[in-house]
Design a protein with these regions (language model features):
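Extracellular/periplasmic catalytic domains that process cell-envelope and extracellular macromolecules
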Residues: 15, 24, 54-57, 88-92
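Second-shell loop/turn segments in exported
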Residues: 6-13, 38-42, 100-107
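Short helices/loops that flank or line small-molecule/ion binding pockets
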Residues: 46-58
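Basic- and aromatic-lined ligand-binding clefts that recognize polyanionic substrates
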Residues: 1-27
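Stable alpha-helical elements in mature extracytoplasmic
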Residues: 15-22, 48, 110-113
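His/Asp/Glu-enriched short active-site or ligand-binding loop at hydrolase and phosphoryl-transfer sites
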Residues: 18-42, 63-66
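Structured C-terminal subdomain patch of bacterial secreted/periplasmic proteins
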Residues: 61-135
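Loop/turn elements at helix/coil->beta-strand transitions in domains of secreted/extracellular proteins
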Residues: 1, 27-29, 57-61, 92-95
């Protein structure tokens, strides 16, 4: 669960954050793992792209957070942000999803997000509420 900010860094949620917890509730494993617990009040941190690659290159699924820097609609748009994404396993397999712009505005949707994640992780062909598969 990340986005690429204006400086080209990957902004990720820290371990123990509610988003990483929801991914784990759905049966997934949040990557990157080495973000540490919240040392400060911020629930996010920036990672240099090379560090993000080392942490997430072999992830089965990538989820791009479109709520912050704008929605992306294709894997090509992700590759335009950094060509290194072409080497990620999830990109090679077409397992890239994004959130909608409204993701953080609907706090009552946590259960639906967990359900979306569960369906994505289980390869269920279900309608998704907060996630959209990129082509």
């Amino acid at each position: 669960f990340f986005y690429i900010n204006s400086t080209g860094s990957a902004n990720v949620r820290k371990n123990g954050d509610y988003v990483s917890n929801m991914i784990e509730l759905a049966g997934g494993k949040y990557v990157p793992e080495d973000t540490g617990e919240s040392d400060n009040a911020l629930s996010t941190m920036n990672m240099q792209m090379e560090d993000f690659y080392n942490a997430a290159q072999s992830a089965d699924i990538l989820i791009y957070n479109s709520a912050i820097e704008g929605e992306i609609t294709s894997i090509d748009e992700l590759l335009a942000k950094n060509s290194l994404f072409a080497q990620f396993d999830a990109v090679k397999k077409g397992n890239v999803y994004c959130t909608g712009k409204n993701f953080f505005q609907e706090s009552t949707g946590m259960a639906e997000f967990v359900e979306d994640m569960h369906n994505v992780l289980g390869d269920a062909d279900a309608d998704l509420t907060y996630l959209k598969k990129l082509n």
